Amino acid sequence: MSLNLERNSKWMEGSGPQADIVISSRIRLARNLKGLPFPNLMNSDQQARVVSQVSRAIQAPMVFQAVGELKLQPLRELAPVERQILVEKHLISPDLAAGGGEKAVVLRDDEAVSIMVNEEDHLRLQCLLPAMMLHEAWRLADAADDALENELDFAFDQERGYLTACPTNVGTGLRASTMLHLPALVLTRQAGPVLSALTKVGVAVRGLYGEGTEAQGNIFQVSNQITLGRSEEEIINNLSAVTVRLADQEREARELLRRQSRWQLEDRVGRAYGVLTNARILSSQEALQLLSDVRLGAEMKIIRGLDQRLLNQLMVRIQPAFLQFSAGKEMTPMERDVHRAAMVRELLAG
């Protein structure tokens, strides 16, 4: 398989319901093959067996009819920087990128469908779409899952459901999540109370790259915590309601800023745009924060002519691995910061 790592993923399109606040919607299904230990207990031969079975399954006509052409890429054939780009594009986890052994990623051309092979579970099927499209992502994931289950013997228990390495995934094996941009809630100091209240309704809040990461650039991921005893529709409907409520609260906070701190807000946005279009050195953390301010300005019509697609692409293109891959060489942190600033200036200049 020949990977086009610089391709823009489907989730970056920046169009769809609630796209002013909801960046992407993701459905992930955890599945394991019957008769084999979980990946953390497998030897390399067993890992290779899983990769081989998945490779055969994705070539089945039924799978093609359900989701189109899928291609498998063994991770051992990728350089560390190439693996890291897949993390930066939200296609694989940091754990899969870092691990050795027989591991793989399966991708559709538009990267809306991907499968991590031999991560925490044998298969982690993911459907990742732009904006608030959880139900559409679920339909795609469900079709892919049904087609794959026709080719693979998944570990399933009549009482407990799909068996997974982590007990919190047992049952449907489904993790639904949305990625939201919530700068006004942060600026008005409402983010802490609002987001901490979500844990009481079974919703987890994480940073830009999921579990264990910080909410850089005012971007948060919210997801369901438990799958056992709940149907797929219940999980998705609950997270959809939470996401829409969060988006409404963010809009209310934006209006509060507009009414009470209009000049400070416009100054903040203008300064951020000025730095991004003129800076010669930019760290990834500073760039993400400034892009958050500019995105807020674009969404509130303080800045005209910037579309969501470009801002979503920049979120990935400013990351260390993507920068080095596009430059065709390994860079020192300072070289990356200089290259990042030049790239941002060029892309914002249009």
From Swiss-Prot:
It comes from Moorella thermoacetica (strain ATCC 39073 / JCM 9320). ATP binds at residues 24-28, 90, 124, 175-179, 206-211. Belongs to the ATP:guanido phosphotransferase family. The keyword Flavoprotein does not apply. This is Protein-arginine kinase. PROSITE patterns: PHOSPHAGEN_KINASE (PS00112), PHOSPHAGEN_KINASE_C (PS51510). Keywords: Allosteric enzyme, ATP-binding, Kinase, Nucleotide-binding, Transferase. Gene3D superfamilies: Glutamine synthetase/guanido kinase, catalytic domain. Appears to be allosterically activated by the binding of pArg-containing polypeptides to the pArg-binding pocket localized in the C-terminal domain of McsB.
